[in-house]
């Protein structure tokens, strides 16, 4: 790649200029606030170096909300461009860049970290653990994700964004058709963030299998913990495929290899297969934790034990197996034989069976329950019909012959948004509101929360339901404009109105966070909603102390905390207090991730010397870690008593 210094910063577009100015002003404002209030030491010692799973979860969620804003703005710009025929709001290249970054950010840098953030906050509490199995690795996982996300996101102001679509199909992603650093940003940003996700998968799989409290057998685990365990197993098997695929495509672009080009025996379809062998399990990586969140919320606010617990566990395991057997349905039209298409058509339809089982589990859980229509419960109730719409249209797409009509039309776009927004995004909002007191010590305002729910949910349906009909009328996806005689104007305009309603809903959520911080009553009890059934609500305060439990609880049944309340069990008798071992904070994961970022940035522009320097930094941090003998520290019984006394006051 012949790099030109006058092309280092992206110029010539007022939208990009506005973004550059806002980034500069925001950075200056953050530095000023931290300096003025003397918070640099606090930021370093309490957050950047923390190994506390709860704080890392909050950092994941904050990052995900920022990415939701960035990806949402991309989506609104796309809808603004398509609102009217022959619109010139965006040119074709800018639209392709936004289309690419929107999909990548929402899947990789918003949905996954949001769910991983909730997992970090909740799962160790649900299994009665003090922290995760590998706290140091947990910090490293976050910072590699964050650095990968930042590397990807600076592309739109430095060098130029990727524009080959979020799937980066070859040969479109080759140097010939996508010159410049944009596609390199995609490959290296995802690679670095993917390393962090793989480490998270290993960490939480070990945590759940090895660190459950006394009496918590696998079949007594909360459903959110079960879905997390299965999700982590999928991550461990799926993400190495993505890692290898990204590495091979990087070799094609950076070093002239031919893994995915027809020259020298390469095969473009190899990329499509590798991408979707990871890509479809990825769908279940972001949907299974959502199922767990809805299970916790529905069971809690229906005040009933989850119906069909064993069937629920079996269906989750079945989905995890089938998720690796359906990837070819993403390219039924690309020349596979009839027998291959038939096999993957059958497996795709089969995966709807265990998914359907869970729908009935939730419905029967609510049957004859004393339901409280809180904001989290409203999101859970909205999820069921909207997700079913997405699922039914998914079965339609699973029919290989019919897919020749639906493929690459807006019918498909509507389908996966009904699955991913109604499934994953609704769950992120529901879980965020449900466990908000566990993170910040107070609830979000219910009245404002319900305004957010209704505006966003109605806007979602106004935006995406018309797209089914646009697809049936032949509107292809990924086009940046259309003619007035195509007959798509009215439905596209309606869809755009719905998209901006969703944007208004997001702003209401942000206002709710501010309003609740100022005016909400601070929670005293660890059971903030009064309907808690699992151990995450059994803590002695709304925000758990850093050691989580003064005495590790003993579990005797499913819904352990619910039964403890019924039996009036004393949770934390002082006679059982013992000194608690906790891990020490460390700044090395941060520096190692920065080194990853330096290496990635250098390789984006093919400055190999910078790439080597960055990788040497990574190796140096690993060597220093191997000579580290810090085994953590102990919290004395007196300190535990003092902490618990302050909590109870």
Curated annotation (Swiss-Prot):
Cofactor descriptive note: Binds a copper B center.
GO biological process: electron transport coupled proton transport; oxidative phosphorylation; respiratory electron transport chain
Cleavable signal peptide: none
Enzyme class per UniProt: oxidoreductase
Catalytic activity, reaction form: 2 a quinol + O2 = 2 a quinone + 2 H2O
Example GO molecular function: oxidoreductase activity, acting on diphenols and related substances as donors, oxygen as acceptor
Keyword annotations from UniProtKB, A to Z: Cell membrane, Copper, Electron transport, Heme, Hydrogen ion transport, Ion transport, Iron, Membrane, Metal-binding, Oxidoreductase, Respiratory chain, Transmembrane, Transmembrane helix, Transport
Positions of transmembrane segments: 14-34, 56-76, 105-125, 140-160, 188-208, 229-249, 274-294, 306-326, 343-363, 377-397, 416-436, 452-472, 493-513, 586-603, 607-624
Localization: Cell membrane
Mode of membrane association: Multi-pass membrane protein
Function: Catalyzes quinol oxidation with the concomitant reduction of oxygen to water. Major component for energy conversion during vegetative growth.
NCBIfam families xrefs: QoxB
Protein's name in the database: Quinol oxidase subunit 1
Protein's organism: Bacillus spizizenii (strain ATCC 23059 / NRRL B-14472 / W23)
């Amino acid at each position: 790649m012949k790099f030109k210094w006058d092309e280092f910063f992206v110029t010539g577009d007022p939208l990009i200029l506005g973004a550059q100015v806002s980034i500069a002003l925001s950075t200056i404002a953050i530095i000023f606030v931290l300096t003025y209030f003397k918070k640099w030491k606090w930021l370093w010692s309490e957050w950047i170096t923390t190994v506390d799973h709860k704080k890392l979860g909050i950092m994941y969620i904050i990052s995900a909300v920022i990415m939701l804003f960035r990806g949402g703005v991309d989506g609104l710009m796309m809808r603004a461009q398509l609102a009217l025929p022959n619109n010139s709001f965006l040119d074709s290249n800018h639209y392709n860049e936004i289309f690419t970054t929107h999909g990548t950010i929402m899947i990789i840098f918003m949905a996954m970290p949001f769910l991983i953030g909730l997992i970090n906050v909740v799962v160790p509490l649900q299994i009665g653990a003090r922290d995760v199995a590998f706290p140091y690795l947990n910090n490293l996982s976050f910072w590699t994700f964050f650095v990968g996300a930042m590397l990807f996101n600076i592309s739109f102001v430095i060098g130029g964004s990727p524009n080959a679509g979020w799937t980066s199909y070859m040969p479109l992603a080759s140097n010939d058709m996508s010159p410049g650093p944009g596609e390199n940003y995609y490959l290296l940003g995802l690679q670095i963030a993917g390393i962090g996700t793989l480490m998270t998968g290993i960490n939480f799989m070990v945590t759940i299998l090895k660190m459950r409290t006394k009496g918590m057998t696998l079949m007594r685990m909360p459903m959110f913990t079960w879905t997390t365990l299965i999700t982590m197993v999928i991550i461990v098997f799926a993400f190495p495929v993505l890692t290898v695929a990204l590495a091979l495509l990087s070799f094609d672009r950076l070093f002239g290899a031919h893994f995915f080009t027809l020259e020298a025996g390469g095969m473009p379809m190899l990329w499509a297969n590798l991408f979707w062998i990871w890509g479809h399990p990825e769908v279940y990586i972001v949907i299974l934790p959502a199922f767990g969140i809805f299970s916790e919320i529905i069971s809690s606010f229906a005040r009933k034990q989850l119906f069909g617990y064993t069937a629920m566990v079996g269906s989750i395991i079945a989905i995890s197996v089938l998720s690796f057997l359906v990837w070819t349905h993403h390219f039924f039209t690309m020349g596979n034989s009839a027998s291959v298409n038939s096999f993957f058509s059958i497996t795709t339809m089969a995966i709807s069976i265990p998914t359907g089982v869970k729908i009935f589990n939730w419905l029967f859980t609510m049957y004859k329950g004393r339901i409280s229509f809180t904001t989290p419960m409203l999101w859970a109730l909205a999820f069921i019909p909207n997700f079913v719409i997405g699922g039914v249209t998914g079965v339609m797409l699973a029919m290989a012959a019919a897919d020749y009509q639906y493929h690459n039309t807006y019918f498909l776009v509507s389908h996966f948004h009904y699955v991913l927004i109604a499934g994953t995004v609704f769950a992120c909002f529901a879980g965020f509101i449900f466990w908000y007191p566990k993170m910040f010590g107070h609830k979000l305002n219910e009245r404002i929360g319900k305004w957010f729910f209704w505006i966003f949910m109605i806007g979602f349906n106004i935006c995406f339901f018309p797209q089914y009909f646009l697809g049936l009328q032949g509107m292809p996806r990924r086009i940046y404009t259309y003619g007035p005689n195509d007959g798509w104007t009215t439905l596209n305009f309606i869809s755009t109105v719905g998209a901006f309603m969703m944007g208004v809903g997001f702003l209401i959520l942000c206002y709710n966070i501010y309003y609740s911080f100022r005016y909400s009553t601070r929670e005293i009890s660890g059971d903030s909603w009064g309907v808690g059934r699992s151990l995450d609500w059994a803590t002695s305060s709304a925000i758990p102390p850093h050691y989580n439990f003064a005495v590790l609880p003993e579990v005797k049944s499913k819904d352990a905390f619910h039964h403890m309340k019924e039996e009036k069990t004393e949770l934390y008798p002082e006679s059982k207090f013992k000194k608690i071992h906790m891990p020490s904070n460390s700044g090395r994961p941060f520096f190692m991730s920065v080194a990853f970022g330096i290496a990635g940035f250098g390789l984006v522009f093919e400055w190999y010397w910078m790439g080597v320097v960055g990788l040497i930094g990574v190796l140096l941090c690993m060597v220093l870690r191997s000579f580290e003998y810090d085994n953590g520290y102990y919290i004395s019984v007196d300190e535990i008593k003092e902490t618990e006394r302050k909590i109870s006051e």
